[in-house]
Amino acid sequence: IGQRFSHVISDAGAHVVLVDIQEKSNKKLENELKSRYHTNPSSFKIDITKKHDVMELQKLVLKKYKKVDILVNNAHSIPRTHPKRDAPFEDYPLELWDEAISSNLRGIFLCSQEFGKVMLKQKKGVIINISSIYGMVGPDQRIYGKSRFDSPAFYSATKGAVVNLTRYLAAYWHQKNIRVNTLTLGGVFDSNLHKNKNFVKNYSNKTIIGRMGKKEDFDGALLFLASDASEYVTGSNIVVDGGWTAW
């Protein structure tokens, strides 16, 4: 979804700064944006859980662009290869919990802290924190069958924390012309991940719209929050979930 957001913002004329620890794919996306939209994107290999890295990123961005209009905190980590990543809650490894808390919360904290300083000096800025419906409600284990919910307890815990960190920052920076909002996403269909037709059917039946989300379903909400169209919106949680949380 981060790649999709990069395209959407670039298409609107923004010079996007891509931040990831995966250098090769990040550079590929940078070149793609540059070629398609004729903007001036950049990509940096940065570990957002390390304060020094984020401080360096701030310096690099300011050196090239002189300002920061929008910060989208979209990064999160779900351990994929650990042998116990799917362990039940009662036996879930503490090291995986700590790893997820670090990437899913510490990264947002550090990026908001360092780029919030820039926005304070500019006297203007927008921060958009990406969360999930499972930061609002518990996952319905019944739709996952024997495999259980694919993303363990830390996912719900950190995504819920994102929503309230947004509210805190919006209130903290009141009257500073820095707007902070959450964009909460419903489940997004991915043909590479969602090969279980029963899961897709069960998930779709729990939404009012009757299907899983498509990546483009979130374009409008992202552009709304990033633009002056939402200048009277801060501390809000914009939920785009096909009606999942409405009943």
Q: Residue spans of the language-model regions?
A:
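Short, small/polar-rich loop/turn modules that mediate ligand/substrate recognition or access, typified
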Residues: H174, R179, V233-G235
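Catalytic Tyr-X3-Lys loop
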Residues: D69, S77, E90-L110, K124, ...
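Catalytic loop of short-chain dehydrogenase/reductase
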Residues: T81, L94-L96, I128-A161, T166-Q175
